[in-house]
Amino acid sequence: MESVAKPATTKEGSAKQAAIVVGVLALGWFAIQVAFIPLFNKVRGGGSDKKDDDVNAFTPDT
């Protein structure tokens, strides 16, 4: 006879299952954020312009 795992029905089992689901969702959200950082920066307008680098360059007083 095969033993089949029973679903978690206790409060402790339900809390553990909920914590795992929340953790997986958070990890998935983080992975999506990391994977699409270049796209998000472009959409938000946060990309660095090459011409702005000259303005911010340090020039010593001579």
UniProtKB/Swiss-Prot annotation:
Disulfide bonds: none annotated. Keywords: Chloroplast, Membrane, Plastid, Plastid outer membrane, Transmembrane, Transmembrane helix. Residues 41-62 are cytoplasmic. It is found in: Plastid, Chloroplast outer membrane. The chain crosses the membrane at residues 18-40. Residues 1-17 are chloroplast intermembrane. It is a single-pass membrane protein. GO terms for cellular component: chloroplast outer membrane. It comes from the Eukaryota. This is 6.7 kDa chloroplast outer envelope membrane protein. It comes from Spinacia oleracea (Spinach). The lineage of its organism: Eukaryota, Viridiplantae, Streptophyta, Embryophyta, Tracheophyta.
